[in-house]
Amino acid sequence: MSDLLVPIIVMLVLVFGEAGILHLTGRQKIDWHDVVFNINSGHIVLWLFRCTEVLCYGLVFSRFSLHLFDSVSPVWLWLFTLLAWDFGFYWLHRLHHTLRPLWAVHVVHHQGEHFNLSLGVRNSWYSSLTGIPFFLVLAVLGVPLSVFLVVSVLHYSVQFFNHNALTPKLGWLEYLFVTPSHHRVHHYKARRFADSNYGGTFIFWDKLFGTFCRVTPPVEPGYGVQGERPSSNPLRESNLPFLRMLGVRKTRAQPPRRFNASATIVIAGALLLFGLVLGYIQLYGYDIERVTTQQTALFLLLAAGSIALGGISDGQRWGVVLWLLVTLGLPLLFIGIWDWRQPYWLGVMAGLVVHALALLAGQGRRVNEAQREPV
């Protein structure tokens, strides 16, 4: 198994594990459709742009590095990178709240209305792209790509943890690190709270630059952003903020829901599709320099599948049609034409076909009576 898969699988287990605990204990009413969208929001497209980020970093390091750390103790290299990465993230995050083009990317993350671990993986397709300029300075200074990647995983793991809904205040750690209690304030709907506590791992950046907020209201003011409630379609949600920013104000409202999809059918489809995403990462990793026809086809079908799941979750018929095309197209191409016969691919693709046929037959799908068309 590729080392890249381990944190992704752990993330998936923790997201559903925490959601299960919150549901069973009654500490939070879980919107399972929202959990699926959070996992589905970035998906394979975000991975492509993460690969682009890694490629850019490697190119800058190989061509423009000053190699300042070549003769420095590894201890100082790692310590510097830990702090410099987090400093860069603080300003990345702060400017994503300040500049409209960057907010158009970051708003997808803040639209989540439930504070739990799944919110930690809710992102725009373009999140990795807008982060590139803030970290390339590390490549210029001479931080090797391998060190950058490990430090990135460490910091993103802390940020993921800081979205959990189970951890209480952490005593003296609250004075040094960003904790869930700090980050919860950042996700409150009121803008005065959202424009504070930008730090990723260390809270002292906020204290140093005047953006720290310790105040917790006696009653939580709710999470998310003002305005129309987002849909479950990642294509729409990742691009609509840019249309609004450009003044395309006649963006169509969400169409009426034609049916209600059960949480079970949506979760099953999301997990099966994510199984193929894991297979994609196992096969291709960060490699986007030697792209094959098969890699391109798999990427496009997985992206289409994530959009289709969003349509199904929103109760749209086109979502069912697109899902059927994707789930039948995958085995037709990869098994029928390209002869992929590995048991893993056969099993997951067979599961997707069964899922699509069950959905088409009406399993997990109930007509929305308010939108029932007359016969």
Language model: regions and residue ranges:
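Transmembrane helix interruption/hinge and helix-loop junction motifs
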Residues: 1-5, 140-149, 337-343
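Structural signature of hydrophobic alpha-helical transmembrane segments
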Residues: 2-15, 20, 287-301, 345-349
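Membrane-interface helix-loop junction between the first two transmembrane segments
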Residues: 17-36
